[in-house]
């Protein structure tokens, strides 16, 4: 059931579906203050407005792009070699790291020297790096020194999505350019619940947010392949995709394929939650081929090292696992250090107990040893490891509610308070932190979760799994959770962990991954609109204009899933002629509201009157016709 070594080492190939450019799109790069800061975006070409709607040029729009070089036809993709390393010069020029002779963790050395793994192993020629003795290489440390790193400038450019260039192109598009730019740039002010979203994201603003702990850039020095991204409530809401094998299903090749598929559709981060065979090798293949940050839950692998017996876990085994993964390039660790012994009995009153795998592992350990976990007791030792590689904390909510019955109970909120205390300890070491959140929460309790997190965790970025707003829809939990995700994203959550239709039922496949990603892109974007994030509405405006003007191809291409939109349209109107028709199959040619609206506008223009006057005149004509016909509501045929 697991990986085929010969396939991976000798014939591993990229998923062809992941490297095709999206329709009418091309990869562009915006250069920063230096030539090696090249920020990727996706440019979507639009057709011109037809003469019947008053001819206009519609310049391309720019959207945030997470697909890395996979959708760039100019890039040579070979997953056996991995991606290029654009961050490596930035890391080296800081002169605060050293190259190690090889892996230093016991487990990493053991895997490297195991001849049985030779054909399975990713053939990495680069050696791992670590901070020089006494140095801190975290983005938070640089930010607090007043240093704007290339990573910070990169994410500032990325967050603005080339908005100014788009508006300038609109202004130059024709005689109505100024008016068109005003129209397409218009957006609702939004309600941000105290967030401080600026009109323009600058590198200095990024630096200040990271220094305060309100944002993080997950960027391990051993993951130079990534295109930096930022997580924080004053930035675009991000989404995380979970992948990973299990003891019963999936291979390394499938997991790499899921990663490239997830980032194609908009996954900002990916968590590898593998619990089956070859966890170390699976992770290496994923990291070397990932342009987005990769997270893990190290306790999963540590548990495998003790044959699944939680009570046999030790600090030494866990520490070795952290170093092993940090040297591979993992960008953020989920660590359930907030599961305290005194909180465990509180879960006895729950409907669904402890549903977090990491939380249940640590709860079992605490009960077996009747003392606080080694994660909690050695938290400052963990910080020392994190800052030597710039691994960010994702402080795990091991006591999150697994049903709406258990939402906002004393165990969940007790752990949240402890996570806030641990956050301040991490910040003392200049280590980046985000906080994980629930879970299963009914809609009316969601804002309380956000408010408590902001207060008790000192505005560290919140990262939530949904939350699911009802428990009655197995098979549709991407929807039950998407509702909660949109809400909590609006209230201030910085990153949303996707839920697929397979949640609670099985391991997701590629189709499920895409469904989860698209659902959560909708939730994140809806939250950006509600917060009033500058420029968030540009894409909506462009699609709405295309819809009104019956530019069908543009509607498909501007949307989050062009393939699905085109497929649905073509189910009933498959001919190419339908792609330029002024109606769809919902209303047909005679009842299309947008077509009728345009006819009213055309009539008004010909008569030299306003649309209101045209509608009034039309109503008067129809009233006269009604009286002349005998004032009968139902006419005899």
Curated annotation (Swiss-Prot):
Q: Which cofactor does it need?
A: [4Fe-4S] cluster
Annotated metabolic or biological route of this protein:
Cofactor biosynthesis; thiamine diphosphate biosynthesis
Q: Which residues bind substrate?
A: 242, 271, 300, 336, 356-358, 397-400, 436, 463
A GO MF label: carbon-carbon lyase activity
Entries under InterPro entries matching the protein: ThiC, ThiC-associated_dom, ThiC/Bza_core_dom, ThiC/BzaA/B
Reactions it catalyzes: 5-amino-1-(5-phospho-beta-D-ribosyl)imidazole + S-adenosyl-L-methionine = 4-amino-2-methyl-5-(phosphooxymethyl)pyrimidine + CO + 5'-deoxyadenosine + formate + L-methionine + 3 H(+)
- Please verify whether the record's keywords include Transmembrane helix: no
**Which positions are annotated as binding Zn(2+)?**
440, 504
* Superkingdom of origin: Bacteria
* Annotated EC: 4.1.99.17
What's in the keyword line of the UniProt record?
4Fe-4S, Iron, Iron-sulfur, Lyase, Metal-binding, S-adenosyl-L-methionine, Thiamine biosynthesis, Zinc
**GO-annotated cellular components:** cytosol
Manner of cofactor binding, per the entry note: Binds 1 [4Fe-4S] cluster per subunit. The cluster is coordinated with 3 cysteines and an exchangeable S-adenosyl-L-methionine.
Q: Which residues bind [4Fe-4S] cluster?
A: 584, 587, 592
Single Gene Ontology BP annotation? thiamine diphosphate biosynthetic process
* Stated role: Catalyzes the synthesis of the hydroxymethylpyrimidine phosphate (HMP-P) moiety of thiamine from aminoimidazole ribotide (AIR) in a radical S-adenosyl-L-methionine (SAM)-dependent reaction.
Q: How does it assemble?
A: Homodimer.
Indicate the family of this protein.
Answer: Belongs to the ThiC family.
In Swiss-Prot or TrEMBL terms, this protein is called Phosphomethylpyrimidine synthase
